[in-house]
Protein backbone atom coordinates (compact mmCIF):
# COMPACT_ATOMS: atom_id res chain seq x y z
CA UNK A 1 0.00 0.00 0.00
CA UNK A 2 2.79 2.41 0.90
CA UNK A 3 4.42 1.98 -2.52
CA UNK A 4 1.15 2.85 -4.22
CA UNK A 5 1.00 6.11 -2.30
CA UNK A 6 4.41 7.12 -3.68
CA UNK A 7 3.36 6.16 -7.21
CA UNK A 8 0.29 8.35 -6.90
CA UNK A 9 2.34 11.26 -5.52
CA UNK A 10 4.86 10.93 -8.32
CA UNK A 11 2.17 10.73 -11.00
CA UNK A 12 0.42 13.78 -9.59
CA UNK A 13 3.66 15.74 -9.46
CA UNK A 14 5.03 14.97 -12.90
CA UNK A 15 3.91 15.69 -16.41
CA UNK A 16 5.78 15.77 -19.67
CA UNK A 17 5.43 18.73 -21.99
CA UNK A 18 5.39 18.60 -25.79
CA UNK A 19 9.22 18.71 -25.87
CA UNK A 20 9.55 15.70 -23.55
CA UNK A 21 10.75 17.78 -20.62
CA UNK A 22 9.75 16.84 -17.10
CA UNK A 23 7.28 19.39 -15.75
CA UNK A 24 7.75 19.29 -11.99
CA UNK A 25 5.10 20.38 -9.50
CA UNK A 26 5.78 21.99 -6.15
CA UNK A 27 4.10 19.03 -4.45
CA UNK A 28 6.83 16.78 -5.81
CA UNK A 29 9.53 19.06 -4.36
CA UNK A 30 7.92 19.11 -0.90
CA UNK A 31 10.62 16.87 0.55
CA UNK A 32 10.88 16.27 4.28
CA UNK A 33 13.60 18.09 6.19
CA UNK A 34 15.00 18.40 9.67
CA UNK A 35 16.61 21.20 11.63
CA UNK A 36 20.20 20.83 12.81
CA UNK A 37 21.30 21.84 16.34
CA UNK A 38 22.69 25.01 14.73
CA UNK A 39 19.22 25.89 13.43
CA UNK A 40 19.96 25.08 9.79
CA UNK A 41 17.69 23.03 7.55
CA UNK A 42 18.74 19.60 6.25
CA UNK A 43 16.71 18.14 3.37
CA UNK A 44 15.93 14.43 3.17
CA UNK A 45 15.61 13.43 -0.48
CA UNK A 46 13.46 10.28 -0.93
CA UNK A 47 14.98 7.69 -3.28
CA UNK A 48 12.02 7.93 -5.67
CA UNK A 49 13.19 11.47 -6.50
CA UNK A 50 16.50 10.15 -7.89
CA UNK A 51 15.10 10.01 -11.44
CA UNK A 52 14.86 13.83 -11.40
CA UNK A 53 18.40 14.44 -10.19
CA UNK A 54 20.50 16.35 -12.75
CA UNK A 55 17.67 16.17 -15.28
CA UNK A 56 16.20 19.01 -17.33
CA UNK A 57 12.93 20.08 -15.76
CA UNK A 58 10.33 22.80 -16.14
CA UNK A 59 8.94 24.56 -13.05
CA UNK A 60 6.66 27.55 -12.65
CA UNK A 61 6.54 30.03 -9.81
CA UNK A 62 7.24 33.55 -8.63
CA UNK A 63 10.58 35.35 -8.92
CA UNK A 64 11.93 36.29 -5.50
CA UNK A 65 15.12 38.31 -4.96
CA UNK A 66 17.76 36.71 -2.77
CA UNK A 67 20.46 39.33 -3.35
CA UNK A 68 19.64 42.04 -5.89
CA UNK A 69 23.20 43.44 -5.88
CA UNK A 70 24.62 40.12 -7.11
CA UNK A 71 21.50 39.31 -9.17
CA UNK A 72 20.68 36.17 -7.20
CA UNK A 73 17.08 35.06 -7.47
CA UNK A 74 14.95 32.16 -6.39
CA UNK A 75 11.76 30.69 -7.76
CA UNK A 76 9.04 30.42 -5.15
CA UNK A 77 5.82 28.49 -4.95
CA UNK A 78 4.31 31.58 -3.31
CA UNK A 79 4.50 35.32 -3.93
CA UNK A 80 7.17 37.28 -2.03
CA UNK A 81 4.96 38.31 0.92
CA UNK A 82 4.10 34.66 1.60
CA UNK A 83 7.32 32.93 0.61
CA UNK A 84 9.99 31.26 2.74
CA UNK A 85 12.02 34.45 3.10
CA UNK A 86 9.23 36.80 4.25
CA UNK A 87 6.25 34.64 5.11
CA UNK A 88 5.78 31.38 6.92
CA UNK A 89 6.33 29.01 4.01
CA UNK A 90 8.68 26.04 4.53
CA UNK A 91 12.14 25.94 2.91
CA UNK A 92 11.05 23.32 0.36
CA UNK A 93 8.89 25.93 -1.41
CA UNK A 94 11.80 27.85 -2.97
CA UNK A 95 14.37 26.83 -5.57
CA UNK A 96 17.66 28.61 -6.23
CA UNK A 97 18.10 29.83 -9.81
CA UNK A 98 21.50 29.88 -11.53
CA UNK A 99 20.85 31.43 -14.92
CA UNK A 100 22.50 30.21 -18.11
CA UNK A 101 22.60 33.84 -19.29
CA UNK A 102 21.82 36.46 -16.65
CA UNK A 103 18.62 38.32 -17.63
CA UNK A 104 18.91 42.11 -17.79
CA UNK A 105 15.90 42.91 -15.67
CA UNK A 106 13.90 40.73 -13.30
CA UNK A 107 10.67 41.74 -11.59
CA UNK A 108 9.88 40.56 -8.06
CA UNK A 109 6.72 38.44 -7.92
CA UNK A 110 6.64 37.98 -11.68
CA UNK A 111 5.05 34.61 -12.42
CA UNK A 112 7.37 32.71 -14.77
CA UNK A 113 8.09 29.29 -16.19
CA UNK A 114 11.73 28.24 -15.91
CA UNK A 115 13.59 25.31 -17.39
CA UNK A 116 17.00 24.02 -16.41
CA UNK A 117 18.92 21.22 -14.73
CA UNK A 118 17.54 20.21 -11.32
CA UNK A 119 20.31 19.74 -8.75
CA UNK A 120 19.75 18.38 -5.24
CA UNK A 121 21.70 20.23 -2.56
CA UNK A 122 22.45 17.81 0.23
CA UNK A 123 25.79 19.21 1.38
CA UNK A 124 25.63 23.01 1.69
CA UNK A 125 23.27 24.17 4.46
CA UNK A 126 23.62 27.79 3.31
CA UNK A 127 21.98 27.14 -0.05
CA UNK A 128 18.44 26.06 -0.91
CA UNK A 129 17.41 22.39 -1.12
CA UNK A 130 17.02 22.50 -4.90
CA UNK A 131 19.01 24.45 -7.47
CA UNK A 132 18.06 24.90 -11.10
CA UNK A 133 21.29 25.37 -13.04
CA UNK A 134 21.46 26.68 -16.60
CA UNK A 135 18.07 28.25 -15.86
CA UNK A 136 16.26 30.11 -18.60
CA UNK A 137 12.73 31.34 -19.07
CA UNK A 138 10.52 28.90 -20.92
CA UNK A 139 7.37 29.41 -22.93
Which residue ranges define each predicted feature?
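Positively charged n-region of N-terminal signal peptides that target proteins for export
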Residues: 1-4
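Bacterial N-terminal signal peptides
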Residues: 6-15
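OB-fold and OB-like single-stranded nucleic-acid-recognition modules
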Residues: 19-139
Amino acid sequence: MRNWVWVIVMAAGLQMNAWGQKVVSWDLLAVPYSTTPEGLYAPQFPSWLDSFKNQEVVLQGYLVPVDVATKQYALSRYAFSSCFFCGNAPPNTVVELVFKDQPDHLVTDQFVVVKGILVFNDDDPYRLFFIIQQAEFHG
